[in-house]
């Protein structure tokens, strides 16, 4: 397994298992299979309504010798401001049937982001969240949280894949010491990413799949990756991306696929295609 180090020296597997849009009725089975295949990083959220299944999978895995402390568990709050965020997190802990999570994220800017961040800082101070961060925060919202934070965000989870590599946002995160993480790293099957001729040619050259090449590329770019699948063989396939070795030429070709624009994000987000030119100095100031 490949690891990254977050703020305060917390380590996490760089390749995790995502649960977005996994039916709550099958989440326990899927998460349990992911753990059996070898994943030790699971990502869920209040919005997904499948935290209980993730929690059940973790409890079941303990019988196989996978302790709770062996799994890097991530969830995301739903709500605006401190009170709503606190309640959302407490509900998540109950659903997950755990005393703590390894990473707690604000899922989305929903208003009073600073108040929401205060709730996360309190969760961190009480030991209920080992690390805290944000998701889908771009120029204005991210800078606002960083300016107000006593504890800066350790992670920002955003749409990121070969067609949208977040080159404008990443310097802002780097300056803040914030790790970038990719949701839907395979572009959720949109825009034909896994049939892209560049990726398929590279995959053929390495006896790999386009999905494996994509995951390996993002890991090489310093991105935490959380692909999702409900099929055990695909889970194993994604995990085997760790064994793929790309060349410098491969990576340059994949970098050239970047369009600079979202292909699957929420159109309602006011900063969906973050452009630092809209925020003078944003690219290199926190």
Can you describe what each PLM-predicted range is?
Residues 1-71, 186, 281-286:
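N-terminal binding-site loop/beta-alpha segment at the start of enzyme catalytic domains
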Residues 7, 85-106, 122-126, 148:
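CE4/NodB-like, metal-dependent polysaccharide N-deacetylase domain
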Residues 39, 98-101, 129, 153:
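A structural motif
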Residues 22-35, 81-97, 115, 140-143, ...:
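Short, acidic/polar
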Residues 22-25, 45-53, 78-83, 109-113, ...:
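Acidic-and-aromatic substrate-binding clefts and catalytic sites of carbohydrate-active enzymes
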Residues 67-81, 102-109, 136, 160:
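A short, structured active-site edge motif that brings together acidic residues
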């Amino acid at each position: 397994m490949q690891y990254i180090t977050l703020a305060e020296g917390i380590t996490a597997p760089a390749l995790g298992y995502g649960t977005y849009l996994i039916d709550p009725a099958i989440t326990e089975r899927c998460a349990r299979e992911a753990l059996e295949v070898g994943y030790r990083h699971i990502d869920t959220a209040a919005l997904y309504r499948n935290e209980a299944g993730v929690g059940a999978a973790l409890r079941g895995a303990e019988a196989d010798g996978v302790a709770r402390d062996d799994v890097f568990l991530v969830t995301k709050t739903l709500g605006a401001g401190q009170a709503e965020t606190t309640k959302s997190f407490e509900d998540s802990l109950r659903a997950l049937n755990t005393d703590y999570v390894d990473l707690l994220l604000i899922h989305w800017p929903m208003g009073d982001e600073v108040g929401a961040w205060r709730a996360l800082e309190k969760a961190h101070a009480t030991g209920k969240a080992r690390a805290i961060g944000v998701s889908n925060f771009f120029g204005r919202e991210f800078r606002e949280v960083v300016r107000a934070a006593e504890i800066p965000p350790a992670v920002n989870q955003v749409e990121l894949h070969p067609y949208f590599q977040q080159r404008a946002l990443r310097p802002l995160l780097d300056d803040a010491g914030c790790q970038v993480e990719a949701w839907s790293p395979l572009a959720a099957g949109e825009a034909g990413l896994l049939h892209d001729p560049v990726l398929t040619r590279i995959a053929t050259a390495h006896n790999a799949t386009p999905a494996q090449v994509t995951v390996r590329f993002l890991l090489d770019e310093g991105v935490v990756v959380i692909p999702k699948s409900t099929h055990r063989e695909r889970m194993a396939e994604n995990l085997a991306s760790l064994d793929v070795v790309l060349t410098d030429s491969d990576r340059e070709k994949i970098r050239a696929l970047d369009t600079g624009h979202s292909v699957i994000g929420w159109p309602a987000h006011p900063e969906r295609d973050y452009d630092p030119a809209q925020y003078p100095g944003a690219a290199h100031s926190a």
